[in-house]
Curated annotation (Swiss-Prot):
Superkingdom of origin: Bacteria
InterPro entries: ACP-like_sf (IPR036736), DltC (IPR003230), PP-bd_ACP (IPR009081)
Residues spanning the membrane: none
Residue numbers carrying O-(pantetheine 4'-phosphoryl)serine: 35
GO CC terms in record: cytoplasm
Pathway membership, UniProt: Cell wall biogenesis; lipoteichoic acid biosynthesis
Entry protein name: D-alanyl carrier protein
Functional description taken from the UniProt entry: Carrier protein involved in the D-alanylation of lipoteichoic acid (LTA). The loading of thioester-linked D-alanine onto DltC is catalyzed by D-alanine--D-alanyl carrier protein ligase DltA. The DltC-carried D-alanyl group is further transferred to cell membrane phosphatidylglycerol (PG) by forming an ester bond, probably catalyzed by DltD. D-alanylation of LTA plays an important role in modulating the properties of the cell wall in Gram-positive bacteria, influencing the net charge of the cell wall.
Major subcellular location class: cytoplasm
Organism: Streptococcus uberis (strain ATCC BAA-854 / 0140J)
Amino acid sequence: MTVEEKIIDAFDRLFMEDVSDIKDEDLFDAGVLDSLGTVELIVELENLFEIKVPISEFGREDWNTVNKIVEGVKELQNA
């Protein structure tokens, strides 16, 4: 599975939301993510990809779409 596929799968498991067709849509505006969901997602991403997501790196505008989350995870994997 690619990073993108794993993240889409995580959204399905955590939030019962298929985000595969809304990869550029703001997930907060779409009602997929909220503050609690963000915490759940960070924990899942850290476990899934064996990375550490610093809270200072997880700004809403930087991680508000699936595509931005994929890029953020890839950057942290390469750090």
